[in-house]
């Protein structure tokens, strides 16, 4: 008796070469339905339609096609159980040896703009997952394949007679993973369309890459991500393989950069061209400029010593002038929405430099959750998204910031939320001058930032991610000539800091919003 293959695929990639190999080289008979059968028939290959095999027509507009005992009995019957084989004989059911199924394109459907509820629901596959799960359960007798990338190995295994128990288990595991991911996608989409709170957090991400190691060489690490979303959608143009630390720094760079916008092309001359330099996930230089090269030079000038071995992110296309700013310094990675040909040619001389093109679309598609692990669980929170509402800011001192100072306060406020707490940023003329990160007390971070800025701090502004518990930071800021301070407020000693500002001639803005980063 010829082996039987059941083929029912939404993605028709590689279908005809597979069908030809099964029929012409391996002697299979093919059962199929719908568009899959139609395509096979168009190549004059023998195929039996599911409705002809089962004697039961498709009903409910195609909702019921393969949900039939003649299909599932043939898949689920164990060949080592005589009672199962007797049941097949009594019901005139043939055993099915190979199931090749992939599912309705639910992800593609819900990715469409303004997709309707009805269209999405109709693209929830029922028969496909049922066949896949049945075959995966009975993998000792039935091979199950769910992805066109598996076809070549499948045919090679048949031809070389290497259909081993291990291969069957491998395909079974991949099949269950396929249906689990599919169901999770549907569950999450429906949850997002309703107002009900999810009682469990479900996520399934494909393996993107095995990394060389984690933060340190003795730690193993892997990268999982949704295709075309976020960093999985980045195109690495050159350089060494990305490391765990590269990815963490790139994420920190992009998070900071998004405060100023992120576009593939610049059509509006007023668009803020910004550059960020990151070291150990902290910004060490941030600036806005009239051009990509100007923004980059000013960001690097913020702290050229710390920039050594860092990560650069630019929120607009990189041109020749910008590339020349990078040409003679040691940088691990550069990410931007686009590099022009001249820029790529200049930077190609730096063989180990990792260049990544990350399009705005990939950034926009990424999920807006911030996830961290704790022992035995996960903490999930909303991203601290770019958002400034100056209408809620309060000027609380006798002196009021000038328009220029307000622009710098807004700039510094955007930066400080991306510095590890306790965080202080000193800035002037849309350029960071000093960063104080990760100290256990706020005045310690202020000291680092002000010392880094040095004499440039005269007339500059200072931002703090949290309130001032005492007035010591204000007094230190005055010693360095700071003109204005922005901070959340909310301390029981706010009045002490405000009084100190008034005595020292410093302006202060309270935002009412904290930006801790742990």
Curated annotation (Swiss-Prot):
Domain of life assignment: Bacteria
A Gene Ontology term for the protein's cellular component: cytosol
Pfam families: AICARFT_IMPCHas (PF01808), MGS (PF02142)
Domain MGS-like: 1-146
Pathway field: Purine metabolism; IMP biosynthesis via de novo pathway; 5-formamido-1-(5-phospho-D-ribosyl)imidazole-4-carboxamide from 5-amino-1-(5-phospho-D-ribosyl)imidazole-4-carboxamide (10-formyl THF route): step 1/1; Purine metabolism; IMP biosynthesis via de novo pathway; IMP from 5-formamido-1-(5-phospho-D-ribosyl)imidazole-4-carboxamide: step 1/1
InterPro entries: AICAR_Tfase_dup_dom_sf, Cytidine_deaminase-like, MGS-like_dom, MGS-like_dom_sf, PurH-like
Entry GO MF terms: IMP cyclohydrolase activity; phosphoribosylaminoimidazolecarboxamide formyltransferase activity
UniProt xrefs under Gene3D superfamilies: 3.40.140.20, Methylglyoxal synthase-like domain
Parts forming coiled coils: none
One GO-annotated biological process of the protein: 'de novo' IMP biosynthetic process
Record keywords: Hydrolase, Multifunctional enzyme, Purine biosynthesis, Transferase
Catalytic activity, reaction form: (6R)-10-formyltetrahydrofolate + 5-amino-1-(5-phospho-beta-D-ribosyl)imidazole-4-carboxamide = 5-formamido-1-(5-phospho-D-ribosyl)imidazole-4-carboxamide + (6S)-5,6,7,8-tetrahydrofolate; IMP + H2O = 5-formamido-1-(5-phospho-D-ribosyl)imidazole-4-carboxamide
E.C. code: 2.1.2.3, 3.5.4.10
Free-text domain note: The IMP cyclohydrolase activity resides in the N-terminal region.
Similarity comment: family membership: Belongs to the PurH family.
Protein's name in the database: Bifunctional purine biosynthesis protein PurH
Gene: purH
């Amino acid at each position: 008796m010829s082996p039987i293959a059941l083929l029912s695929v939404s993605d028709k990639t590689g279908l005809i070469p597979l069908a030809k190999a099964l029929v012409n080289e391996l002697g299979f008979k093919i059962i199929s339905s719908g568009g899959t059968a139609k395509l096979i028939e168009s190549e004059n290959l023998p195929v039996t339609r599911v409705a002809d095999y089962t004697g039961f027509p498709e009903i409910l507009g195609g909702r019921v096609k393969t949900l039939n005992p003649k299909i599932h009995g043939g898949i689920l019957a164990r060949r080592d159980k005589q009672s199962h084989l007797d049941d097949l004989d009594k019901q005139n059911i043939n055993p099915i040896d190979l199931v090749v199924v992939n599912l309705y394109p639910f992800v593609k459907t819900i990715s469409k703009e303004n997709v309707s509820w009805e269209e999405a629901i109709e693209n929830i596959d029922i028969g496909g997952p049922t066949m896949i799960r049945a075959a995966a359960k009975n993998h000792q007798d039935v091979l199950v394949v769910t992805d066109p990338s598996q076809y070549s190995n499948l045919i090679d295994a048949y031809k070389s007679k290497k259909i081993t128990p291990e291969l069957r288990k491998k395909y079974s595991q991949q099949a269950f993973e396929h249906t689990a991911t599919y169901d999770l996608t549907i569950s999450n989409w429906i949850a997002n369309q309703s107002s009900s709170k999810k009682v469990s957090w479900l996520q399934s991400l494909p393996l993107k890459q095995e990394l060389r190691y984690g933060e340190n060489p003795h730690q193993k690490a892997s990268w999982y991500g949704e295709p075309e979303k976020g960093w999985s959608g980045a195109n690495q143009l050159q350089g060494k393989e990305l490391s765990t630390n590269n990815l963490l720094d790139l994420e920190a760079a992009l998070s900071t950069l998004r405060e100023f916008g992120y576009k593939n092309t610049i059509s509006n001359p007023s668009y803020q061209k910004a550059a960020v330099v990151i070291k150990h996930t902290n910004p060490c230089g941030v600036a806005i400029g009239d051009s990509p090269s100007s923004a980059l030079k000013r960001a690097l000038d913020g702290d050229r010593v710390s920039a050594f071995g860092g990560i650069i992110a630019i929120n607009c296309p990189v041109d020749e002038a910008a590339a020349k700013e990078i040409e003679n310094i040691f940088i691990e990675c550069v990410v931007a929405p686009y590099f022009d040909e001249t820029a790529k040619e200049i930077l190609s001389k730096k063989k180990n430099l990792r260049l990544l093109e990350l399009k705005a679309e990939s950034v926009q598609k990424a999920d807006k959750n911030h996830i961290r692990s704790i022992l035995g669980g996960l903490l999930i929170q909303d991203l601290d998204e770019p958002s400034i509402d100056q209408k809620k800011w309060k000027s609380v001192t006798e002196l009021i910031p000038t328009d220029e100072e307000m622009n710098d306060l807004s700039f510094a406020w955007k930066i400080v939320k991306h510095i590890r707490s306790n965080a202080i940023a000193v800035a002037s003329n849309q350029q960071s001058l000093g960063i104080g990160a990760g100290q256990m007390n706020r005045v310690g971070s202020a000291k680092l930032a002000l010392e880094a800025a040095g004499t440039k701090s005269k007339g500059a502004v200072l931002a703090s991610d949290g309130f001032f518990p005492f007035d010591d930071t204000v007094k230190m800021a005055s010693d360095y000539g700071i003109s204005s301070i922005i901070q959340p407020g909310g301390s029981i000693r706010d009045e002490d800091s405000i009084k100190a500002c008034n005595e020292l001639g410093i302006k202060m803005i309270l935002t009412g919003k904290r930006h801790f980063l742990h």
